[in-house]
Amino acid sequence: LKSVLGYVDTKNYTYGQLFNETNARTGGIQCGIDVFDKANDPEAFRTMFTIRGKALYSQMDFLFQMMEEILNTSKLSDTRRLGEIIGEIRSRGQASLIGAGHQTAVLRSAAYGSPMAEYQDEMAGVGYYKFIEDLEKNFQEKKDEIVAGLQNAMAEIIRKDSFMVSYTGERESVEQVKTLSGALKK
């Protein structure tokens, strides 16, 4: 899901339009997963799906409008586009694993002794690469399952009752951010 949102068509934009508009008027919008350990329990951790964006104050309305568009209207059922995205992720992942082999090895070895590192490996390391490689190899057989999985993940992850906004900027804009972020909770 983190690798798909922002890279598929939405209700009002094709992927290309979304990409061009977002990058022309903001510093970008990225989805990801953050992992936080619990200080009093080295085996426990918490994960959060994140959507991050940067914009000048004059483009703040647009930034939140585009975040809302991505979160609420992304077309996750376009299997042709999903196949392209999976291929791109596999290619970039392969280059990343090779180019940063030392980091890959550290994460993979840590995954054997730490539940948090194991999760991180599954989300961004060798485990993730193997998952993506399997999806690409068996895409035709799994495409309906992939779409259903993405749609279920959206329903489970993007929820009003577990929504948090983190803002860095001028104090004068806090109220504007509170108002704009309300639309993301739909």
What annotation goes with each model-predicted range?
Residues S166-K186:
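An aromatic/glycine/proline-enriched structural segment found at the starts
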Residues L1-T73, T79-Q140, K160-G169:
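M16 family metallopeptidases and their MPP-like homologs
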Residues A155-R159:
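Residue-level signal for alpha-helix termini/capping positions
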Residues K2, F19, E68, Q151, ...:
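Generic solvent-exposed, charged/amphipathic alpha-helical segments
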Residues K142-M154:
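Structured alpha-helical segments in the cores of large, soluble enzyme domains
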